[in-house]
């Protein structure tokens, strides 16, 4: 729902459908957003473009596990990694003016850059000019440091423009309020969250405690 949240805040967009294979994530999405009348697709591989209305924008955060440094990095050899091609298939059929894609930063360097080169070639073949940039959520008011690559595709001959003219906006970090062991640390909630030590013991060792104003 990250794309949906941002576009709702921006205004001027109407969501006509969404795709989510995880039943719990789907339930959360439907709790957060009014999806009445929207088309729902469980599996991107089974989407028939003829079931979609004309659309101006496709947003897709295709699965990152296949490209993340935290995983096995099997790339397109992992079924999850091939879901990008489903996005391209639908885009080729529906020809939206814009594509907005997101994934982990390591997508750029995975397989010595060959994976990202394939993505660029596919988007070029279906008629999209592409730009991309790595952005950190910490610079946009989110209390965590999370780098992601954002890719925009502009339908050639129909849409063109520039994007990603961003600057640092939220350099604050969390203040440690109470000293002590990893499991006993308490932080203020007005800055960036620290990365917890997964092997720390004790109460809240893996999550941390935050002072939240009420």
Give, region by region, the residue ranges found by the protein language model.
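SAM cofactor-binding core of SAM-dependent methyltransferases
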Residues: 1-45
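Class I S-adenosyl-L-methionine
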Residues: 47-57, 65-214
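Glycine-rich, N-terminal phosphate-binding loop of Rossmann-like dinucleotide-binding domains
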Residues: 62
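Short, hydrophobic/glycine-enriched beta-strand segments
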Residues: 2, 57-59
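Generic enzyme active-site microenvironment
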Residues: 18, 41, 59, 100-101
């Amino acid at each position: 729902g990250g794309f949906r949240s941002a576009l709702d805040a921006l205004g001027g967009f109407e969501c006509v459908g969404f795709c989510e294979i995880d039943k719990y994530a789907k339930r959360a999405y439907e709790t957060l957003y009014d999806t009445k009348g929207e088309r729902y697709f469980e599996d991107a591989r089974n989407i028939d473009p003829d079931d979609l209305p004309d659309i101006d924008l496709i947003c897709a955060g295709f699965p990152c596990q296949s490209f993340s440094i935290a995983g096995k990095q099997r790339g397109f050899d992992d079924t999850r990694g091939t879901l990008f091609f489903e996005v391209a298939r639908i885009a080729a059929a529906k020809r939206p003016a814009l594509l907005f894609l997101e994934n982990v930063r390591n997508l750029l360097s995975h397989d010595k850059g060959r994976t990202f080169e394939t993505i660029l070639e596919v988007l070029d073949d279906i008629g999209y000019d592409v730009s991309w940039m790595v952005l950190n959520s910490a610079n946009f008011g989110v209390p965590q440091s999370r780098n992601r690559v954002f890719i925009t595709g502009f339908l050639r001959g129909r849409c063109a423009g520039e994007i990603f003219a961003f600057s640092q906006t939220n350099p604050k970090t969390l203040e440690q309020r109470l000293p002590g062991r990893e499991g006993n640390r308490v932080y203020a909630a007005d800055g960036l969250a620290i990365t917890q030590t997964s092997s720390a013991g004790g109460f809240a060792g893996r999550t941390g405690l935050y002072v939240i104003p009420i």
